[in-house]
């Protein structure tokens, strides 16, 4: 699969003057609830109305969706508001029912993207259709798995594709329900710059008070749109109550978001930008040289350990380095999260170099 301008055609054809907005409840609960939310969203920036019909819950016994009857409610949404409709599908049966009920957009959830078998089943059942299909990132932070899901759909001749960044599950402590791991989405964007990229701040945040800042950051990173869970009575929602906003709150969020220019033609701006970028390039080159020298020293330590039959990993020394770097990093305006990621990667590379020496 190669990047192509055609990837963005379905989005361009919507002819929007603002980022794409997909909104609606985490779960379709009743016909009245679904229609009320949709009508409240009719005169907003929302283009696609989403609702969970089948809910893949972590544990049995939790609300797992109303099922196929909810698709009839979405037909009424389209009839009353003109909004496009979207649901999550997790198997060929879901796809068949969604198509039969005229659903416009299908998305593959994070729990499904992790399974090549599920994605392939969905891809096979979509062959010959013209639906828009959006692929959420897998639960675990694995770009290859995310790309694999997209490629399976593309190979099934499904060309109206996009991706949804909803964050990743990790064991690390975080204020977010799912860590954004922005660099993974950015890497995907760099490989396929014309593949529509949508942020789901609701699932990243897990809390409605974090949604605005996440949405702004996504737009600052040139995302094409947002998927925000919206409910008429979020505190009493049957699922994910804490991360849903009211339609009026959604309007406020969209009103306050700033849409940045991709670039401008001012000569002074371009000259200053070129100067700053040159400084970054120089700094990056110095970083690589320093890291190379550090690995040279790590290899010498590896030789010393080998000659004295000493184990590679020295936890006490590693913890001392990490503690010192966190303190030093903060004095340079670097977050603890960033320092941990950088030095864990450096430490792992050092271990790899020393392990190669011990095994040689």
Indicate where each model-derived feature is located.
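N-terminal amphipathic alpha-helix/helix-capping segment at the start of soluble metabolic enzymes
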Residues: 1-22, 76, 255, 265
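Domain-level signature for soluble enzymes in the chorismate/prephenate branch of the shikimate pathway
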Residues: 262-360
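Catalytic alpha/beta core domains of metabolic enzymes, predominantly
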Residues: 14, 118-249, 256, 261-269
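Glycine-rich, proline-tolerant flexible connector loops at the mouths of alpha/beta enzymes
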Residues: 50-68, 232-241, 301-312
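Catalytic beta/alpha-barrel core
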Residues: 66, 82-91, 95, 104-119, ...
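Hydrophobic faces of well-ordered beta-strands that scaffold small-molecule active sites
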Residues: 19-25, 47-51, 85-87, 106-108, ...
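Catalytic domains of carbohydrate-active enzymes, especially glycoside hydrolases
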Residues: 36-53, 101
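Active-site mouth loops of central-metabolism enzymes
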Residues: 19-36, 60-65, 84-89, 109-110, ...
């Amino acid at each position: 699969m190669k990047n192509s301008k055609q990837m963005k055609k379905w989005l361009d054809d919507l002819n929007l003057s603002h980022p794409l907005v997909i909104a609606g409840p985490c779960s379709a609960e009743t016909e009245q609830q679904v229609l009320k939310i949709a009508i409240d969203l009719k005169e907003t920036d929302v283009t696609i109305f989403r609702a969970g019909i089948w809910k893949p819950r972590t544990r049995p016994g939790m609300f797992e969706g109303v099922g196929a009857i909810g698709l009839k409610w979405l037909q009424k949404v389209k009839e009353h508001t003109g909004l496009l409709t979207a649901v999550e599908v997790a198997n060929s049966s879901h796809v068949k029912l969604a198509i039969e009920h005229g659903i416009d957009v299908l998305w593959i959830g994070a729990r499904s993207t992790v399974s090549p078998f599920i994605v392939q089943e969905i891809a096979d059942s979509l062959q010959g259709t013209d639906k828009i299909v959006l692929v959420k990132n897998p639960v675990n932070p694995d770009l290859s798995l995310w790309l694999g899901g997209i490629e399976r759909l593309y190979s099934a001749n499904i060309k109206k594709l996009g991706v949804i960044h909803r964050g990743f599950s990790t064991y690390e402590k975080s204020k977010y329900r799912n860590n954004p791991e922005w660099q993974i989405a950015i890497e995907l964007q760099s490989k396929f710059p014309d593949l529509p990229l949508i942020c789901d701040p609701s699932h990243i945040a897990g809390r409605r008070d974090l949604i605005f800042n996440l949405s702004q950051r996504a737009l600052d990173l040139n995302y094409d749109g947002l998927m925000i869970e919206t409910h008429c009575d979020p505190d009493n929602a049957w699922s994910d109550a804490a991360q849903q906003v009211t339609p009026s709150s959604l309007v406020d969020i969209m009103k306050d978001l700033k849409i940045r220019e991709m670039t401008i033609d001012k000569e002074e701006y371009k000259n200053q930008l070129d100067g700053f970028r040159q400084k970054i390039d120089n700094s990056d080159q110095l970083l690589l040289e320093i890291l190379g020298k550090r690995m040279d020293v790590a290899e010498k330590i590896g030789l010393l350990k080998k000659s004295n039959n000493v184990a590679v990993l020295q936890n006490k020394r590693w913890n001392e380095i990490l503690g010192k770097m966190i303190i030093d990093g903060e004095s340079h305006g670097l977050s603890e999260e960033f320092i941990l990621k950088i030095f864990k990667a450096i430490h792992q590379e050092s271990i790899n170099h020393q392990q190669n020496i011990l095994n040689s």
